[in-house]
């Protein structure tokens, strides 16, 4: 599970600038699909070896009377569910009544709140930030979000205390010698655990109905088992002699009250469920078609590398010409996830619901399919023979060998000379070649390219990202103790 960082502050203090810097395009090929709409307020950040969910609470505003209680419900919910709140203020504008109003609201939330003075570039940050100590929220962290100044130190200072609570927050180091062994251990752990299935979708697409239909078909005794993912409920179940854990984000709490259950939608809770799941079942409303919110959720699923099954709900009762038009639109807008199975269902009447688990099982099997080094290297050689890599700086790129780097999603690591200079088009070609050769269905594939270091280039030892972060923390602590 990843921690949630909420960016709070009045308008024009730099929340969006910091958000954009933290959620810059990631290197993972699974996110490199045309036609993908990315949400502007919720994102997955991978910054300087730290990964987390970041929320831009744009609905927060303040005035002389204090906090505006009519602020957006999603913004309030995001603050309530956040692990860290970064309260941004404008160092150039100084302390305002709106800042004081927001601070008064945040003090009541019992959250880890850090004051962040933005726009300190070109001014005396210490003197211009002094007034913000009056907010009564502790030290003032100085940054220039537009240029990235102080951002790494800020994240290290605010997120490192959570490292034990969120072990997945730190991106693993590239220890290539043990990578294959670690991948094998990860696979063994996955295969020994139940399949975690998250049913996600925007409000009122039928997630609650589908959850209840699935549980009703299984005829099992269902009880509330609180999970670790905020308010999501983890429901154990069995199907076809296979254990599952259904991650319920729809707000359903007890079987006896499902008829009057009101669906509660939380974007943060949905993102946490996606991170926790092995397979994500995305529910789309057939009558509304594919919306930008659906595409945003798809973006989070792809960035997380989770297996994917798409269910188009409310299919019963539609005329044939309407169904044909919907299918054409789905083909056009969802062409970038051609690896995912698409099902047309009616959660209310149970039509085709039973077939969903065939695709869930197929997707999970693809995501956890054991792949050895010799097979991957052979496929890599075949791909090179069919379509040679390009010439870079007068030398043809040479891929030497490939091995497994992880599962769920399958990660394939290719080693060679100048492989990092390969154009994106060739990287996509390699990804698609591996997908077809391995007959992978229902899961994205991530391909990483590594270059061997020249042992004669330098005699100095290079620090890892983890060592650099620890060094910065020690230097900061030493500076504060002076």
Swiss-Prot record:
Residues 3-166, 195-368 form the EngA-type G domain. GTP 1 binds at residues 9-16, 56-60, 118-121. Pfam families: KH_dom-like, MMR_HSR1. The keyword Nucleotide-binding applies. Residues 369-453 form the KH-like domain. This is GTPase Der. Associates with the 50S ribosomal subunit. The gene is der. It comes from Pseudoalteromonas atlantica (strain T6c / ATCC BAA-1087).
């Amino acid at each position: 599970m990843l921690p949630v960082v909420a960016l709070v502050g009045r308008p024009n203090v730099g929340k969006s600038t910091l958000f954009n810097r933290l959620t810059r395009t990631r290197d993972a090929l699974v996110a490199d699909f045309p036609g993908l709409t990315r949400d502007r307020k919720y994102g997955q950040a991978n910054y300087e070896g730290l990964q987390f969910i970041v929320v831009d609470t744009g609905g927060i505003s303040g005035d002389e009377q204090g906090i505006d209680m009519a602020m957006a419900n999603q913004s309030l919910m995001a603050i309530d569910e956040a692990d860290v709140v970064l309260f941004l203020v404008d160092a150039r504008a100084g302390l305002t009544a709106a800042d004081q109003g927001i601070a008064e609201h945040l003090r009541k939330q019992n959250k880890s709140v850090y004051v962040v003075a933005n726009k300190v570039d070109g001014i005396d940050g210490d003197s211009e930030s002094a007034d913000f100590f009056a907010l009564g929220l502790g030290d003032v962290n100085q940054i220039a979000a537009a240029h990235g100044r102080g951002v790494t130190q800020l994240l290290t200072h605010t997120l490192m205390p959570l490292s034990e609570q969120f072990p997945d927050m730190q991106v693993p180091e590239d220890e290539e010698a043990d990578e294959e062994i670690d991948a094998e251990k990860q696979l063994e752990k996955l295969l020994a655990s139940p399949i975690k299935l998250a049913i996600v979708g925007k409000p009122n697409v039928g997630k609650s109905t589908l959850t209840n239909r699935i549980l009703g078909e299984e005829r099992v005794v269902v009880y509330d088992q609180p999970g670790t993912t905020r308010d999501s409920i983890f429901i154990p179940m069995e199907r076809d002699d296979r254990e599952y854990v259904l991650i319920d984000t729809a707000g359903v709490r007890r079987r006896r009250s499902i008829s009057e259950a009101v669906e509660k939608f939380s974007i943060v809770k949905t993102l946490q469920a996606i991170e926790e799941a092995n397979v994500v079942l995305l529910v789309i409303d057939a009558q509304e078609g594919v919306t930008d919110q659906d595409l945003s959720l798809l973006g989070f699923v792809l960035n997380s590398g989770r297996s994917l099954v798409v269910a188009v709900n409310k299919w019963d009762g539609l005329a044939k010409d309407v169904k044909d038009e919907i299918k054409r639109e789905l083909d056009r807008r969802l062409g970038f996830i051609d690896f995912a199975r698409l099902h047309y269902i009616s959660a209310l009447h149970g039509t085709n619901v039973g077939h969903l688990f065939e695709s869930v099982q197929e997707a999970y099997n693809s995501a956890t399919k054991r792949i050895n080094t010799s097979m991957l290297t052979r496929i890599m050689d075949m791909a090179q023979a069919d379509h040679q890599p390009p010439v870079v700086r007068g030398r043809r790129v040479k891929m030497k060998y490939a091995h497994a780097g992880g599962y769920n999603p399958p990660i394939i690591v290719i080693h060679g000379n100048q492989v990092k200079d390969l154009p994106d088009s060739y990287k996509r070609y390699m990804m698609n070649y591996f997908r077809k050769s391995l007959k992978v269905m229902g899961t994205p594939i991530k391909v990483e390219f590594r270059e061997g270091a020249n042992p004669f280039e330098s005699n100095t030892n290079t620090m890892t990202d983890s060592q650099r972060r620890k060094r910065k923390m020690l230097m900061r602590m030493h500076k504060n103790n002076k």
